[in-house]
């Protein structure tokens, strides 16, 4: 009997340990699998997709490049198909230029991306849009290559 109890305790411990490795946040397996396929990663804020500036915008611009709009529309529709109807869109910039200008630019870029999601069926109240300007760089702004990485818009499934 004691042998069976020990075996049961060992199995229960392993299951508990492994379940921590398979954290999906609050999502089901299919939702998490789709997000991973799209390039999302699980972060402290939620499932996050980083959209680099060079793919979406021209330098110092907040209008989406026409070639990128269909990909954002498809992403929006796919999120809705998987009942992922609440998102946060966050704009970021590098540290070149006036901080208040960068803050405004990050807000405009996030708003532009949000508008595409609204046009493809997201309800306005289910999208939180914000700019963080220069406040959260991915890497130090010590080179042009690093500054490019810091100019981005993140889509977050909270």
Task: Name what the model sees in each region.
Residues 47, 85-87, 127, 153:
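Conserved beta-strand core positions
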Residues 92-158:
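Periplasmic OmpA-like peptidoglycan-binding domain that tethers envelope proteins to the cell wall
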Residues 49-55:
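Early exported N-terminus immediately downstream of N-terminal targeting peptides
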Residues 1-47, 63, 70:
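N-terminal targeting leaders that direct proteins to extracytoplasmic destinations
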Residues 19, 77, 114-115:
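Core alpha-helical elements of the protein kinase catalytic domain
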Residues 34-36, 41-42, 56-90, 118, ...:
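Periplasmic peptidoglycan-binding/anchoring modules of Gram-negative envelope and division proteins
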Residues 16, 35, 82, 122-124, ...:
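Short, well-ordered coil/turn elements that cap or connect secondary structure elements
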């Amino acid at each position: 009997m004691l042998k069976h109890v020990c075996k049961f305790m060992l199995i229960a411990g392993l299951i508990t340990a492994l379940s921590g490795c398979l954290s999906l946040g609050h999502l089901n397996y299919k939702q998490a699998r789709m997000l991973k396929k799209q390039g999302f990663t699980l972060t402290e804020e939620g499932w996050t997709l980083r959209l680099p500036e060079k793919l979406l915008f021209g330098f110092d611009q907040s209008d989406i490049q026409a070639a990128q709009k269909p990909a954002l529309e498809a992403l929006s529709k796919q999120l809705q198909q998987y009942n992922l109807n609440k998102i946060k869109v966050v704009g970021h910039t590098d540290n070149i230029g006036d901080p208040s200008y960068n803050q405004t630019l990050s807000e405009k870029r996030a708003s532009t991306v949000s508008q595409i999601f609204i046009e493809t069926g997201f309800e306005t109240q289910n999208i939180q849009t914000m700019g963080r300007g220069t406040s959260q760089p991915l890497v130090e702004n010590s080179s042009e290559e690093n500054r490019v990485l810091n100019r981005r818009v993140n889509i977050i499934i909270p």
